[in-house]
Amino acid sequence: MGKKTLPREGSLRRTLVLLLGAAVYAMLYALCSQIDENGVSCMDVTLRRFCMGFPIAACILYVLFHNVFPRMEFRPDTEQNGKPFCIWGAVLLIFLCYIPLFLIEYPGTFSYDSMKQVQQIASGEYSTILPLLHTLMIRLCISFYGILGSLEKCGAIYSLLQMALMSLCFAMICAALSRSVSRRAARIGVAFFCLYPNHMAFASSCTKDGLFSACLTLFMALCFEEAYTGKLTTGWRIIRVLAGVVACLMRSNLLLAFAAWLLVLMLTRKQGGRFLLREGALVFSLALICNALLAGMTHASGGTVKELLSVPAVQMARARLYAGDRLTDRQKEMMDSMFAVNAENMEAFYQTYDPTVADSIKNFLDEDAVRSRWQEYLALWVSVGRVCPDIYLDAFLNLALPSLYPYKTFHVTHRYIETGCGNALTSPFGLPPLSLPERFKPVQQWLDVHLFSTGADDVPVIRWLFNCGVVFWLLGAMVLFAGYRGDGTIVLTMTLLVFYWITHLLGPVMQGRYLYPFLCALPFFMARPQRKSSTEPLRRKNEIKTDEDHDGGSVDERNHL
């Protein structure tokens, strides 16, 4: 690929994007490197590290945008360049790559919220706190107990079903890469989905994040395809809508991201992004309808606001614990009234604060009090923040560090990826624990200790594949590169994942499963079709056909004649 020259008319945009990106990365380094080292930040150190990091970040981004990323673009296929991409062959290959870890963890991983979901199934009392679609999927597999007589086999059915569905989604994502970028990009995508360790771990894990990530990635990959090629068949449009709806049903905070995304699409009114607004509005509407139908069918109770209040809860708890002398008695009394904890146990309750996990604090929020007096508590949160801005900042950074910075050590108290089955399938039904085979016990223990517990902190190369911050920084660089090149429709498409990342920062803990949808997005964020020149625009939807299509010759040929 030859040396590229950039037009003058985009120089201001490129300069602004470069400076903005450098400022963001420098600030993240200045703040988060301190949190990674000692858990607190200092203004003087922050300013010093920002001034040091800004020019370095600007130089690195300039090299990436001018020399590295353009060379990673794929040449478009020609008609004679190999056979068409085989979706079902890719499905089989990806599925077979997930079998070994499934056998090691047989009948699969049933942790995270699995116990709560099985308890809902056993009691018949459902709640929208957990995704109803995923709970009903587990119920479907457990319903085979009458035939199989073993919950172990029911769990294996769930794992195999999820592995098949995720393999199908990943194969369709690679097919979209083949059509919109190149078959070589699709083959690299297949290798990525086959061999990346996280895919193997989550394919047989009973968590909503597996199918959610696969469906969200498929939805976005098909949006990228239409943005690049300007066309998409009716069948693939239907698949795109279904994937988007299922993703929204699996995670309610994606609905918030969709709402913000649609607002941006309406405000920008970019011609090339009209299909995004149309498809996004359809997915958003259908997801709301399906959520209401599922809740009505199962008579599910309402959800909770505790998850959304994770960050404010830990910020005030940290302020009470570490800066109580700055607070007034009135503020302390108001803060105590937020939590369903006895007065004599209140001090011990604040001592349970964990900087990396919000569960010990937000689980004790008095939801009725918060709902009825939300204006007072909002004013309390603001007033405490005015006197403790440093405490608030450190509380947020400690909680969100894995999503903001390529950390040296995985500091989170919870495991990076939870494995094992435990009593999740049997305890809610009053049955004895499963008797699982132990033929792969040594391998399972080694994986738990060296990979899944700490995100491979002690494994030299693999640790960077598991590092959440590396993935987020790489995705951020690709978003900036799209803006640097002036690919407006691509930037708008990427914005959906950016908004989901923002909602993700408000969560109670950062584990590997929260990284997973962003990890799945890497192939189509990084795979870009090669342009003939740096100024060539993306192929637009409903491209204007030349007279050659109608009259048997091009305009230039007829003018020559």
Language model features: what each stretch is:
Residues S204-F212, M250:
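Short acidic/glycine- and proline-prone juxtamembrane loop motifs at membrane-interface regions
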Residues C59, L160-S180:
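Transmembrane-helix motifs of polytopic, lipid-linked glycan transferases
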Residues K153-I157, D394, N398-T493, L497:
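Membrane-interface anchor segments at the N-terminal boundary of transmembrane helices
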Residues L132-L136, I147-L168, V190:
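Loop-to-helix entry region of an early transmembrane alpha helix in multi-pass inner-membrane enzymes
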Residues G302-E438:
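Membrane-proximal stem/loop segments at transmembrane-domain junctions that anchor or position
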Residues E105-Q117, E125-C141, L148-K153:
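Extracytoplasmic catalytic/substrate-binding loops of multi-pass membrane glycan-assembly enzymes
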Residues R237-R251, L262-L263, V283-A287:
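Membrane-interface alpha helices of multi-pass inner-membrane proteins
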Residues I94, A186-P197, G244-C248:
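Short helix- or helix-capping micro-motifs
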